[in-house]
Amino acid sequence: MADLQTQMKQAVAAAAVEQIKDGMVLGLGSGSTAALMIQALGAKLASGELREIVGVTTSFQGEVMAAELGIPLRNLTAVDRIDLAIDGADEVDPSFQLIKGGGACHVQEKLVASRADRFVVVVDSTKIVDRLNLGFLLPVEVLPGAWRQVQGRLAELGGIADLRMAQCKAGPVVTDQGNLVLDVSMAGGIGDPEDLECRINNLPGVLENGLFVNLTDEVLVGQISDGVAGVRRLQRRE
């Protein structure tokens, strides 16, 4: 039997797929929960429950998985719009601001989320926090030749930034865009995500950071009640 966290992820993945309609262009996110959603989508396409779906992936890993499941794919530059994007998150605060980028895919993830008419985030209950960056580091993608300079500038903003090192190869993590990632801890967490997102992105050498501000329309939260996995729906108030 799957552990409780996996059960929560499976529940929200299934709930997210229920929002998909025939003919949609979908943003297919990255990470473990999004992977379960892609698997569930593939099963519905194979059974004929869904038809004429086109996916836009946010990572090479997601592209490989979707292709193996027979999900038709297009590049982001080949679509005029995205009806619905579904993705996971590393942290979600009460204002629906996110930290993403644990898998170093946040640049493409943010491009897809910002293009979508609706952006739905799927997480288990462990990802809901009162304040961002107290438990998860903020990823910042930087040009390879600029990481030392950016590291120093982030320190001026009150952050401690470490170069992310790879687990299965020697040297640092290299993103799909060929860049490096700094993982940042801000003293006391992030109180104003919108301001910090702008400040970091204005630093020379920074491509993008993992703060997703004012993009999320709905959060589906997997939770366990009386030993049974269920889903809580949180919708942003305009």
Curated annotation (Swiss-Prot):
Gene Ontology BP terms: D-ribose metabolic process; pentose-phosphate shunt, non-oxidative branch
Enzyme class label: isomerase
Record EC number: 5.3.1.6
Superkingdom of the source species: Bacteria
Any one GO CC term of the record: cytosol
Active site: 109
Pathway the protein acts in: Carbohydrate degradation; pentose phosphate pathway; D-ribose 5-phosphate from D-ribulose 5-phosphate (non-oxidative stage): step 1/1
Keyword Isomerase attributed: yes
Catalytic activity, reaction form: aldehydo-D-ribose 5-phosphate = D-ribulose 5-phosphate
GO molecular function, one term: ribose-5-phosphate isomerase activity
Cited SUPFAM superfamilies: D-ribose-5-phosphate isomerase (RpiA), lid domain (SSF75445), NagB/RpiA/CoA transferase-like (SSF100950)
Residues annotated to bind substrate: 30-33, 87-90, 100-103, 127
Keywords carried by this UniProt record: Isomerase
Function statement: Catalyzes the reversible conversion of ribose-5-phosphate to ribulose 5-phosphate.
Assigned protein family: Belongs to the ribose 5-phosphate isomerase family.
Subunit and interaction comment: Homodimer.
NCBIfam families named among the record's database cross-references: PRK00702.1, rpiA
Protein name (record): Ribose-5-phosphate isomerase A
Source organism per UniProt: Prochlorococcus marinus (strain MIT 9303)
Organism placement in taxonomy: Bacteria, Bacillati, Cyanobacteriota, Cyanophyceae, Synechococcales
Gene that encodes it: rpiA
